[in-house]
């Protein structure tokens, strides 16, 4: 299995946020320092794109890296601009079933080290479609009879 990684897509969003921040700084410098006599409608042009980013605040991007490991796969996730990383080992011995979630996540019921069932959500909304299908296929290979609970 090829590694599943969405680093490129999330990095494009990160640099778009950086560019937008520089755009806002430039508009404020231009309006208040270079040409204070310009109309205030220019400030509206600086803040209009923020409404395009509103959906991304709700659906904040995460880095997802899934690699094949012995008898299963290792899934690492990390939020954008965060240092904390979460790892999840999915094997045929601990993967019990799926549970129903929204269209942004895959819900997995996994056994922990004390043999207690835990629910884990994997955010897949920032994956490309072919990577999402590869992840689902690998989960199907690990446990082809996993029911939806």
Residue ranges and their predicted role:
Residues 73-77, 97, 107:
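Short hydrophobic/aromatic-rich beta-strand segments that constitute the beta-sheet cores
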Residues 64-68, 96-99, 110-112:
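Short, exposed beta-strand/loop patches in secreted or surface proteins that constitute
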Residues 1-36:
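N-terminal membrane-targeting/pre-transmembrane regions
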Residues 23-27, 48-53:
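Alpha-helical transmembrane segments
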Residues 32-48:
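Hydrophobic alpha-helical transmembrane segments
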